[in-house]
């Protein structure tokens, strides 16, 4: 599968939830652009884009199971979901492992290993900062609240 096919599959997975579809398109667009401007190699760029597309894959399940999309729950549920989602995508095991790692850590702002993780987290932290009141930015938690 190419990026467009993974995007199409993720949109279908979203079951018409316009918020989820809009969010994944925004995150993917920013991740794609930043990755290209940073000059990522092809494999890292592709991994970043797939992680950006699938990073909130657990949101529908979390809404149903827990009544919210708490970041910790997304991380717990997201890894196995994205592995299953990508099973027929024709990616290497290493690439699926990396995407699953990124999806299951996208609310964790410590121990960032790799530019793909740094870009994905950077996009999320920017969004989180918008939610905080002026003067409160220094109080960013180690894990984000629900998204």
Regions picked out by a protein language model, each given a short descriptive name:
Residues 27, 72-88:
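An active-site-proximal "capping" alpha-helix that borders the catalytic cofactor pocket
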Residues 12-25, 29-41, 54, 91, ...:
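Divalent metal-dependent phosphate-bond-processing catalytic cores, especially two-metal-ion Mg2+/Mn2+ enzymes
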Residues 2-26, 58-69:
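Active-site flanking loop/helix segments enriched in acidic
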Residues 4, 28-29, 79-81, 97:
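A generic alpha-helix surface/boundary motif
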Residues 91-97:
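Short, flexible active-site-proximal loops enriched in glycine and acidic residues
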Residues 45-67, 78, 100-107:
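His-Asp-centered metal-binding catalytic motifs of divalent-metal-dependent phosphohydrolases/nucleases
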Residues 42-44, 95:
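Membrane-helix interface segments
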């Amino acid at each position: 599968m190419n990026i467009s096919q993974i995007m199409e599959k993720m949109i279908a997975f979203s079951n018409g939830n316009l918020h989820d579809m809009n969010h994944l398109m925004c995150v993917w667009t920013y991740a794609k652009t930043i990755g290209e401007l940073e000059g990522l190699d092809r494999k890292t760029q592709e991994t970043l884009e797939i992680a950006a597309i699938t990073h909130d894959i657990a949101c529908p399940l979390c809404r149903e199971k827990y009544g919210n999309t708490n970041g910790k729950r997304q991380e717990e549920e997201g890894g196995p979901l994205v592995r299953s989602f990508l099973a027929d995508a024709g990616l290497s095991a290493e690439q699926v492992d990396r995407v699953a790692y990124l999806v299951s850590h996208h609310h964790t702002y410590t121990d960032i290993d790799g530019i793909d993780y740094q870009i994905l987290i950077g996009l999320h932290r920017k969004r989180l900062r918008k939610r905080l009141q002026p003067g409160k930015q220094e109080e960013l938690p180690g894990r984000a609240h629900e998204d």
